[in-house]
From Swiss-Prot:
GN (gene name): icc
Organism superkingdom: Bacteria
Positions of disulphide bridges: none
High-level lineage: Bacteria, Pseudomonadati, Pseudomonadota, Gammaproteobacteria, Alteromonadales
Protein's organism: Colwellia psychrerythraea (strain 34H / ATCC BAA-681) (Vibrio psychroerythus)
Protein name as catalogued: Probable cyclic nucleotide phosphodiesterase CPS_4178
Positions bound to Fe cation 2: D62, N94, H160, H198
Pfam families: Metallophos
Keyword flag Lyase: no
Broadest EC class assigned to this enzyme: hydrolase
GO molecular function (one): 3',5'-cyclic-AMP phosphodiesterase activity
Binding-site residues, Fe cation 1: D21, H23, D62, H200
Cofactor(s) named in the record: Fe(2+)
Length: 263
């Protein structure tokens, strides 16, 4: 899908919000490690709604915690209750069923497109869901990515699983075919950054193995709308932090700015 809003002459950016890992239950009162995850999602969506500079939202997966269809409906209801009108693009996380996402996200403001073309940027949503909690970008998905990349545009890739280890337990559920993935990424000099969910925390990382002719590709991870993981615990444990999301601003000259919003 092409967003037709032009860049202004004074290089004003296109800004969007990344949200991730809502981990909803069938019950609107469902708690995930002591946190009301639906209430946290609502806080995030209301914050986004209050920011008129945000032109669209990308949800990078793990909508559900209990794998019920009602949890998907609760997400949709929350979006409508918060009066979100900007397009919402989406990816499946390891907890999600892609067919259920498509079923419940079939009407506006949800958009099923996995590619957003701007005047000077291309944002691609990369499927990393596998049959296990870990991620895998299959050969077909890698070929699709290569075929879609427009060499005259700056590239930002969005995915659920992290392609760089973060140093705590979630790494055993990270991207399993990192080498094949990075072999593709490092063959392009216009991929500026990758953004992911899954790790329940915000970090800025670079791949240790990069092409000698290219600048290192930056990985931005996103805080969850549900809970933030405690990286000192070998397993799921929640920090005493609220929900969060990440903002990206894409400029016509190729500059990318990002900031994390915690609530």
């Amino acid at each position: 899908m092409t967003i037709t809003e032009p860049y202004s002459p004074n290089n004003q950016p296109i800004t969007f919000a990344q949200i991730t890992d809502s981990h909803l239950f069938s019950s609107v009162d469902g708690l995930h490690h002591g946190h009301n995850v639906l209430a946290n999602l609502k806080k995030v969506l209301l914050s986004i709604c209050d920011n008129p500079s945000i032109k669209y939202i990308i949800f990078t997966g793990d909508l559900t915690q209990d794998h019920t269809e009602q949890s998907y409906q609760n997400f949709v209801d929350c979006v409508l209750e918060c009066h979100i009108t900007v397009p919402i693009y989406y990816l499946a996380g390891n907890h999600d069923e892609p067919k259920l996402l498509d079923k419940y996200f079939s009407a506006s403001p949800f958009q099923a497109d996995k590619e957003i073309n701007l005047s000077h940027w291309q944002v691609q949503l990369v499927d990393s869901k596998s049959a296990t909690p870990a991620g895998y970008v299959g050969e077909q998905a890698l070929v699709k990515l290569k075929d879609a990349i427009q060499k005259n545009k700056n590239q930002l890739l969005m995915m659920h699983h992290h392609p760089i280890d973060v140093g705590y337990f979630i790494d055993k559920h990270g991207l399993q075919n990192k080498d094949a993935f990075w072999q593709v990424i490092n063959s392009y000099d216009n991929i500026k950054a990758i953004a992911c969910g899954h790790v329940h925390g915000d970090m800025t990382l670079t791949n240790a193995i990069t092409s000698p002719i290219n600048e290192p590709v930056v990985l931005y991870t996103c805080p969850a709308t549900s809970i933030q993981f405690d990286p000192t615990v070998d397993g799921v444990a929640a920090l005493s932090k609220g929900p969060g999301y990440r903002l990206f601003s894409l400029y016509a000259d190729g500059q990318l700015n990002t900031e994390v919003v915690m609530l």
